[in-house]
């Protein structure tokens, strides 16, 4: 099991191992590649987050429009029922 907290000694040992494995010349290349990868990952996650927010907003607008349409539809039905009732009273 790998410990979650690294102390100063562990970090120094890790850096020495990396230096021995890759050499001093390749470490800047690796750091650049890692930085580029992290940047692309952040762009991707922020882009996905923005898409989700846009879709959420569109769905809320659609639901709001449906509720308004249903409410206006109910209002029209009530008006028709009232008109029919009044017409029936006038005839009777």
Swiss-Prot record:
Give me the ranges of the annotated region Disordered: 43-92
InterPro entries attached here? TatA/B/E, TatA/E
* Subunit organization: The Tat system comprises two distinct complexes: a TatABC complex, containing multiple copies of TatA, TatB and TatC subunits, and a separate TatA complex, containing only TatA subunits. Substrates initially bind to the TatABC complex, which probably triggers association of the separate TatA complex to form the active translocon.
Q: Where is the composition biased (Basic and acidic residues)?
A: 53-80
Q: What is this protein called?
A: Sec-independent protein translocase protein TatA
Q: Which organism is it from?
A: Rubrobacter xylanophilus (strain DSM 9941 / JCM 11954 / NBRC 16129 / PRD-1)
Which GO-annotated molecular functions does the record name?
protein transmembrane transporter activity
Looking up HAMAP family in the UniProt record yields: TatA_E
Which Pfam families does this one have?
Answer: TatA_B_E
Q: Transmembrane stretches, by residue range?
A: 2-22
Which NCBIfam families does the annotation name? tatAE
Q: Which family does it belong to?
A: Belongs to the TatA/E family.
| Assigned keywords, A-Z | Cell membrane, Membrane, Protein transport, Translocation, Transmembrane, Transmembrane helix, Transport
GO BP field: protein transport by the Tat complex
Q: What does this protein do?
A: Part of the twin-arginine translocation (Tat) system that transports large folded proteins containing a characteristic twin-arginine motif in their signal peptide across membranes. TatA could form the protein-conducting channel of the Tat system.
GO cellular component terms attached to this protein's record: TAT protein transport complex
The encoding gene is: tatA
Per UniProt, what is the membrane topology? Single-pass membrane protein
**Subcellular location per the Swiss-Prot or TrEMBL entry:** Cell membrane
């Amino acid at each position: 099991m790998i410990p979650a907290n690294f102390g100063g000694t562990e970090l120094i040992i890790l850096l020495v191992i990396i230096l021995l494995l890759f050499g001093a010349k390749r470490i800047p290349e690796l750091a650049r590649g890692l930085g580029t990868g992290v940047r692309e990952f952040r762009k991707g996650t922020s882009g996905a987050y923005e898409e989700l927010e846009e879709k959420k907003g569109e769905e809320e607008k659609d639901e709001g429009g449906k509720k308004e349409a249903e409410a206006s539809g109910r209002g029209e039905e009530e008006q028709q029922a009232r008109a029919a009732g009044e017409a029936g009273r006038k005839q009777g």
